[in-house]
């Protein structure tokens, strides 16, 4: 492929297509701090705060977006997830970048080079070695805490298993970094009853709580123990991200005790029994979240680990997940209604991966809003494969049509990379351009200060108020 001849691609007005958009972005959105309420960053790396050292570590070690792009470009797996040298892996990524035009990877790559390293050149083979050296010189001295502060990241919420001892979150709290780092309670492993890994996981929880989980009542007691522990350490969010259709069925509490005991005896459970157990657990957890004042998140609509060959070679999160087409909105309705009926429905965010279900999810969340809690039920930001210009615009437009965009809690990275935070800038530029276009078309009043305040709320204030971050320990 020929060389791309464009040095100043990321300009001050990148993605801003009118004077109104420029004013909204530069005067209202640009300088706001970042609230990243869902990501997969390592609390250990932040606590230890050692320099990242190498751009390949930062960009390519766990980034399944880039892995998919490299595979699509014909790169051999050895240069993606294999044992090729860091430099060779970077060179293969540089070969791939020019071929990512119109994929969000192209925009993200150039934004990250610009914001963290002040590099204007398009990454490509002819300048790859120079950029590799320059980025590494910066990363040899930049620690995770410094990278976060550089981007004005005020709050991040990591994703953590209930058995985590949160030692690194405690260390971070004592270190008094610019960025506050809070855990998120993600109990996915509790839902795999009927599988061998469930029994192994129960033993792991027993080690945490120091008592036997020989019945369902003791499991709930153990869950209470871990939720209390997370709450004491600043947690106010949960997350649910199991592959497959969201399901919810009727159950009887006594029956769940019997199902748990049956599994403990090694007797194979029926599919109905598994769903009954999961439904009971969902209700119990959600009521506990409500009791604690937490926000619950549901990431729905993904089919994971489609490629057995790569899954066996690399493991989960190899870049072999995709959009699913599950029917699940009736089950979600029944679940939310069961909690709302007893006034035990916590603040809730749902993220759907299938864009054909955008209006379905947006309208479902609007069914359960409550007086006194603005935006209680959130249809979340464009997620994963939808986290790109078209997907973000569609999410903003559907939410505007079906709900209140003004109460939206804004963007998150859902990332494993400390260099991913320009995605907030990306979202903010798109948001400002969408609102400016409405002004130009006469669809909203030409009141820049009013709309600017709305943009500030979406990008920052709404999240602060929704999660009550100012009230954290």
Where are these regions (language model features)?
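Catalytic core of soluble alpha/beta enzymes
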Residues: 246-262, 280, 298, 302-346, ...
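Metal-cofactor-binding active-site regions of metalloenzymes
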Residues: 2-292, 344-346, 350-355, 362, ...
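Residue-level detector of anion-binding/catalytic polar loops
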Residues: 295
């Amino acid at each position: 492929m020929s060389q791309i001849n464009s040095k100043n691609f990321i300009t001050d007005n990148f993605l801003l297509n009118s004077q109104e958009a420029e004013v909204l972005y530069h005067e209202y959105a640009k300088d706001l701090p970042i609230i990243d309420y869902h990501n997969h960053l390592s609390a250990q790396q932040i606590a230890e705060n050692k320099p990242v050292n190498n751009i390949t570590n930062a960009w390519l070690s766990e980034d399944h977006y880039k892995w998919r792009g490299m595979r699509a470009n014909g790169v051999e797996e050895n240069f993606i997830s294999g044992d090729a040298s860091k430099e060779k892996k970077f060179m293969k990524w540089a070969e791939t970048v020019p071929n990512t035009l119109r994929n969000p990877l192209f925009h993200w790559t150039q934004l990250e080079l610009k914001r963290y390293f002040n590099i204007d050149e398009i990454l490509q083979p002819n300048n790859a070695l120079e950029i590799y050296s320059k980025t590494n010189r910066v990363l040899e001295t930049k620690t995770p805490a410094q990278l976060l502060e550089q981007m004005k990241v005020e709050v991040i919420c990591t994703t953590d298993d209930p058995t985590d001892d949160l030692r690194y979150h405690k260390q971070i709290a004592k270190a008094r970094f610019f960025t506050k780092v809070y855990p998120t309670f993600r109990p996915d492993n509790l839902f795999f009853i009927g599988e061998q890994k469930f029994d192994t996981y129960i033993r792991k929880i027993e080690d945490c709580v120091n008592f036997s989980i020989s019945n369902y009542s003791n499991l709930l007691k153990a869950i209470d123990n871990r939720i209390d522990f997370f709450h004491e350490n600043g947690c106010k969010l949960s997350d649910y991200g199991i592959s497959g259709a969201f399901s919810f069925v009727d159950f009887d509490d006594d029956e769940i005790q019997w199902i748990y005991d049956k599994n403990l005896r090694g007797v194979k459970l029926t599919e109905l029994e598994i769903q009954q157990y999961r439904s009971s657990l969902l209700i119990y957890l959600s009521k506990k979240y409500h009791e604690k004042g937490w926000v619950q998140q549901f990431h729905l609509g993904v089919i994971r680990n489609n490629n057995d060959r790569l899954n066996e070679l690399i493991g989960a999160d190899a870049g072999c997940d995709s959009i699913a087409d599950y029917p699940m909105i009736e089950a979600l309705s029944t679940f939310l209604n069961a909690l709302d009926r007893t006034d035990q429905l916590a603040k809730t965010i749902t993220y759907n991966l299938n864009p054909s279900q955008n209006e379905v999810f947006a309208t479902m969340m609007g069914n359960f809003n409550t007086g006194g809690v603005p935006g209680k039920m959130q249809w979340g930001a464009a997620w994963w494969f939808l986290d790109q210009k078209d997907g973000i615009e569609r999410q903003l437009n559907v939410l505007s049509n079906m709900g209140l965009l003004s109460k939206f809690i804004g963007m998150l990275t859902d990332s494993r990379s400390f260099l991913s935070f320009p995605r907030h800038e990306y979202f903010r530029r798109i948001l400002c351009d969408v609102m400016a276009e409405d002004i130009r078309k006469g669809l909203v009043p030409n009141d820049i200060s009013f709309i600017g305040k709305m943009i500030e709320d979406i990008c920052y204030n709404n999240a602060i108020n929704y999660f009550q971050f100012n009230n954290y320990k």
